[in-house]
Amino acid sequence: MYKFRIQGSDKPLSGEVTISGAKNAALPILFASLLAEEPVEVANVPKLRDVDTTMELLKRLGAEVSRNGSVHIDASGVNDFCAPYDLVKTMRASIWALGPLVARFGKGQVSLPGGCAIGARPVDLHIHGLEQLGATIKLEEGYVKAEVDGRLKGAHIVMDKVSVGATITVMCAATLAEGTTVLENAAREPEIVDTANFLNAIGAKVSGMGTDTITIEGVERLGGGYHEVVADRIETGTFLVAAAVSGGKIVCKNTKAHLLEAVLAKLEEAGADVQTGDDWISLDMTGRELKAVNIRTAPHPAFPTDMQAQFTLLNMMAKGSGIITETIFENRFMHIPELQRMGAHAEIEGNTAICGDTDGLSGAQVMATDLRASASLVIAGCIAKGETIVDRIYHIARGYDKIEDKLTALGANIERVHSDDL
């Protein structure tokens, strides 16, 4: 079991960091490659545990998968239609295999997935969407099993609630359906737009992505193509917050400002000087006072839930107090008790956290509880006084590509160590 050992410092985190491709776009795109009858090349794919698991799953299904810079996938030889428990037990994204399998092959089954411990993430919306396209769904022996006689049929679908995952499932499956599908109350996240752009690159006819109404005109087959994954807006925001809370100056390269406008607006409200270019974002906190801000998470284009933990830390270190309201997931303040172990001030009332006016942090042994919470603990360790040990860092490996190397380049003193060496 590996942990992070961090020697805290009052030295600002400053420098340049190159942002990786977005995990939340790369995963659905890799699964969507199952729709293609010809080879596809996907560039700018981050090197993450979930990506490795997805590539292994595609191989298990019969696809040829290799990585040489880009990820190359040839799904022409897929001959197995089951995503087994041993591969998907740690990754809820595996549900995205179901839509492409049933759309192209008429059948598919996926073990009910796992993932982060941040509340209920039911697959009901995925199932309901596929049923409206004509699939028959059964839940048996821990598996979601889908079948259709012939092709799926286009439908007018109104999502019961805004869901990124279910929007992707329905959008991908509908590409090979007979007729046109109109998906209303669709999620609008940039990663959905990117997935749609990939689908169009291999021959799909998807329009309206980025709005709440997506139209998919079904085609008989999808070929091959090339696509470059969009930049990771959450990794971008995480490093911007790291610079802000440490009083540093940073340039994030290979990223786009339009992906995280709500986050940039809150950073400016917190007192940071934020500048943007075609493929970069800079933040300068030198000589500036960090001010607490109020945050309410909501579906895109509002403030993203995946940046909530990082802004919880920002508010703790800022002047004044800020109110953070979490509307997307229950049980997503699990990082706060860990930050309190380091001396942070916060009160939790239901889905609201009030934090601020923390007079410095002290190093401590803390435990990561989910992907984004772990990022806030790592940043806290960088600015705390003394040594911090972050346990269960396998969470962070699911979503951040070489985070310790990137933080080291900004001046942090962080190393990955085995438990036996502590």
Swiss-Prot record:
- Highest taxon of the lineage: Bacteria
Q: Which InterPro entries match?
A: Enolpyruvate_Tfrase_dom, Enolpyruvate_Tfrase_sf, MurA_subfamily, RNA3'P_cycl/enolpyr_Trfase_a/b, UDP_GlcNAc_COvinyl_MurA
Q: Which reaction does it catalyse?
A: phosphoenolpyruvate + UDP-N-acetyl-alpha-D-glucosamine = UDP-N-acetyl-3-O-(1-carboxyvinyl)-alpha-D-glucosamine + phosphate
Which residues hold phosphoenolpyruvate? 23-24
The pathway this protein participates in, as annotated, is: Cell wall biogenesis; peptidoglycan biosynthesis
EC number, UniProt record = 2.5.1.7
Q: Which UniProt keywords apply?
A: Cell cycle, Cell division, Cell shape, Cell wall biogenesis/degradation, Cytoplasm, Peptidoglycan synthesis, Pyruvate, Transferase
Record-listed 2-(S-cysteinyl)pyruvic acid O-phosphothioketal modification sites:
116
Which cellular component, as a GO term, is one annotated location? Answer: cytoplasm
What are the catalytic residues? 116 (proton donor)
Query: Can you tell me which residues bind UDP-N-acetyl-alpha-D-glucosamine?
Result: 92, 121-125, 161-164, 306, 328
* Family under the similarity heading: Belongs to the EPSP synthase family. MurA subfamily.
Protein name, per record? UDP-N-acetylglucosamine 1-carboxyvinyltransferase
Organism field: Aliivibrio fischeri (strain ATCC 700601 / ES114) (Vibrio fischeri)
Gene assigned in the entry: murA
